[in-house]
């Protein structure tokens, strides 16, 4: 019998496979030790001794598996150099020397039990001389547990899945199909390369860096995901090998220039079409700050997703394509450049970096004239939206595909004298966030995972493990069981961080995006009716009382009706009209009463700007932006 296939069956199958292919080494040894009669037995005593043998076999197997079985183990890779090593669970109390089959089985046990083919085995081998058998088994099991708990485990398991599919097209035993040294070498490379991002995500004992959410916005195909992927590579969050793998896959699909964006577009559909749909998330670090990239979709069908991303952002990066024709398409009416910039301002983004991308394109060739032309067209519009060109906006040229001017000064644009993109981000002044303010965490998403887990950005206040909170507007009392900040477990968090919080006392079905986690003693306001100042951005016809639209406020999306128009506001002087208007039209500002279909959480803009500014959308267009002035109590 082939020992490698037998070992594979024993390591993976547990008790489900037949006697012919389940851990043959243990069965042989037990048979050798059993003093019972021949195969055909001798009446009652024969059956008794066979029962005893079966019992001993069962105990042996269950003891072995209960101690060492690891469902997350890496795929079995034979290691020819470790044949002499036998783990403690295969040595019986007083056992004769093992047969070659047993040694092969032992070799397999080492490979699968340790979770890695060579390095963990060698370390435990050194220590087996000093300690007892139990020490060895501890040494074997510990790396597995650590591996399971690291924050990088999603990426690791994904890498291994890839490896299994490549190495074992026709079942488990094909591990012998190529030289074991080669596969072992590959696995060792894997071990060395994966932990790199780990230290970047959670440096132990280091002072906590300020956390900043950056949303990449702009027209479809301006290069947002490519720049995001390039930043991930330049800051060491994606290794060269992974990037080369994306490049190979992109070439196979004739999408050669898209490979960088695949670091953020993880969904297969997004990769095939080259369009971001969801808001992609990724992390990178500079010397002073920890950044989360929110890569917003640029296509107009996905603007609601983009609003969700912008509502969590501290800083927006507007990506513009300098390529002839592309800039004009994105900026003219119908393009997303205008709408995205406006929505970012409405969502509360104070600082805007405008990256003029694709400067390496043959139609541009790092032309200063083209750069200035794009800048001249953008400034008046951004000023109109509400950004201050001197304080809030910073322009810079770059190439997402080559990485020019992202981390280091580029020789291609000697005319640009500012800092490159990543150093500029690192030197931004700190954001003022209220640690002492009331707890406000708007829910972005929720899912089940050993309880109910909610996702969101903590806007103000601080949360710690074991704290009692309230989920508004339903007034559900909940307890915080665990907190993950950017997938790293922590006991307490400050404002501005992206969190996953495990809650007790509420079911996942009882939560909707737009709900707010609050302090017991300081609940947020909730209701259906409020007065607001709104600016009509784009609407062909007039808007009268009774008009319906979709309200986007913080992470909440709800249907809303304008029930009454109270007065018009003069744009320049701010004076309010004495009479009630019968309608409003494009470019006018008015104060109106709005009523939502369901109860929502909101605050006045004056008290809490993040929960007091909103957008009205209709038929796929942004109709108006506004701010909440007054909450109107419900009539019973």
UniProtKB/Swiss-Prot annotation:
Residues 209-435 form the tr-type G domain. Coiled coil: none annotated. Keywords: GTP-binding, Hydrolase, Nonsense-mediated mRNA decay, Nucleotide-binding, Protein biosynthesis. Residues 274-278 are annotated as: G2. Residues 1-54, 90-206 are annotated as: Disordered. GTP binds at residues 221-226, 357-360, 399-401. Residues 357-360 are annotated as: G4. Residues 218-225 are annotated as: G1. The keyword GTP-binding applies. It is an enzyme of class 3 (hydrolase). One of its GO terms (molecular function) is translation release factor activity. Residues 183-193 have a biased composition (Acidic residues). Residues 1-16, 103-116 have a biased composition (Gly residues). Belongs to the TRAFAC class translation factor GTPase superfamily. Classic translation factor GTPase family. ERF3 subfamily. PANTHER family: TRANSLATION FACTOR. Component of the eRF1-eRF3-GTP ternary complex, composed of ETF1/ERF1 and ERF3 (GSPT1/ERF3A or GSPT2/ERF3B) and GTP. Component of the transient SURF (SMG1-UPF1-eRF1-eRF3) complex. The ETF1-GSPT1 complex interacts with JMJD4. Interacts with PABPC1. Interacts with SHFL. GTPase component of the eRF1-eRF3-GTP ternary complex, a ternary complex that mediates translation termination in response to the termination codons UAA, UAG and UGA. GSPT1/ERF3A mediates ETF1/ERF1 delivery to stop codons: The eRF1-eRF3-GTP complex binds to a stop codon in the ribosomal A-site. GTP hydrolysis by GSPT1/ERF3A induces a conformational change that leads to its dissociation, permitting ETF1/ERF1 to accommodate fully in the A-site. This is Eukaryotic peptide chain release factor GTP-binding subunit ERF3A. It comes from Mus musculus.
């Amino acid at each position: 019998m082939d020992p490698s296939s037998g070992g594979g069956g024993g390591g993976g199958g547990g008790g489900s496979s037949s006697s012919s292919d389940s851990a043959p080494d243990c069965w042989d040894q037990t048979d050798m030790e059993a003093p019972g009669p021949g195969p055909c037995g001798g009446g009652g005593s024969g059956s008794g001794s066979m029962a005893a043998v079966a019992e001993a076999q069962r105990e042996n197997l269950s003891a072995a598996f209960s101690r060492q079985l690891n469902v997350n183990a890496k795929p079995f890779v034979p290691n020819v150099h470790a044949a002499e090593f036998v783990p403690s669970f295969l040595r019986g109390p007083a056992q004769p020397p093992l047969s070659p089959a047993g040694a092969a089985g032992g070799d397999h046990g080492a490979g699968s039990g340790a979770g890695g083919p060579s390095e963990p085995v060698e370390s435990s081998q050194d220590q087996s001389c000093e300690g007892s058998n139990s020490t060895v088994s501890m040494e074997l099991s510990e790396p597995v547990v650590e591996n399971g708990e690291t924050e990088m485990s999603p990426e690791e398991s994904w890498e291994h899945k890839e490896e299994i599919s490549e190495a074992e097209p026709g079942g488990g035993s094909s591990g012998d199909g190529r030289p074991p040294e080669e596969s072992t070498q590959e696995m060792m490379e894997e071990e060395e390369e994966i932990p790199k991002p780990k230290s970047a995500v959670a440096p132990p004992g280091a002072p906590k860096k300020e956390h900043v959410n950056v949303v990449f916005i702009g027209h479809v195909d301006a290069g947002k995901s490519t720049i995001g992927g390039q930043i991930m590579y330049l800051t060491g969050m994606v290794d060269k090998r992974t990037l080369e793998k994306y490049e190979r896959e992109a070439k196979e699909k004739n999408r050669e220039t898209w490979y960088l964006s695949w670091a953020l577009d993880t969904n297969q559909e997004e990769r095939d079409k080259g369009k971001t749909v969801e808001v992609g998330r990724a992390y990178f670090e500079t010397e002073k700050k920890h950044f989360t990239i929110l890569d917003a979709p640029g296509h107009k069908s996905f603007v609601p997703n983009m609003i969700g991303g912008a509502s969590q952002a501290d800083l927006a990066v507007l990506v513009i394509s300098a390529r002839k024709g592309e800039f004009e398409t994105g900026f003219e009416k119908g393009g997303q450049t205008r709408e995205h910039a406006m929505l970012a301002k409405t969502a509360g983004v104070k600082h805007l970096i405008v990256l003029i991308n694709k400067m390496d394109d043959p139609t541009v060739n790092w032309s200063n004239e083209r750069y200035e032309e794009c800048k001249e067209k953008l400034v008046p519009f951004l000023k109109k939206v509400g950004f201050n060109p001197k304080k809030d906006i910073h322009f810079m040229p770059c190439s997402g595909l080559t990485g020019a001017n992202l981390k280091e000064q580029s020789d291609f644009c000697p005319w640009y004298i500012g800092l490159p993109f990543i150093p500029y981000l690192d030197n931004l002044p700190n954001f003022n966030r209220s640690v002492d303010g009331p707890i406000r965490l708007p829910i972005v998403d929720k899912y089940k995972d050993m309880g109910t887990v909610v996702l969101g950005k903590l806007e103000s206040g601080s949360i710690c493990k074991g704290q009692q909170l309230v989920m508004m507007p339903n007034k559900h009392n909940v307890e915080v069981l665990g907190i993950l900040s950017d997938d790293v477990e922590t006991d307490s968090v400050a404002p501005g961080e992206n969190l996953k919080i495990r809650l007790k006392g509420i079911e996942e079905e009882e939560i909707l995006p737009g709900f707010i986690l609050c302090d017991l003693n300081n609940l947020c306001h909730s209701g259906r009716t409020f007065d607001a100042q709104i600016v009509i951005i784009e609407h062909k016809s007039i808007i009268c009382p009774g008009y319906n639209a979709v309200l986007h406020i913080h992470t909440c999306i709800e249907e809303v009706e304008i029930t009454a128009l109270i007065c018009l506001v003069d744009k320049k002087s701010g004076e309010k009209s004495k009479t009630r208007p019968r309608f409003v039209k494009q470019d006018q500002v008015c104060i109106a009463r709005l009523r939502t279909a369901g109860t929502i959480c909101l605050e006045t803009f004056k008290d809490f700007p993040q929960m007091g500014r909103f957008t009205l959308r209709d038929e796929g267009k942004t109709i108006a932006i506004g701010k909440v002035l007054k909450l109107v109590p419900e009539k019973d």
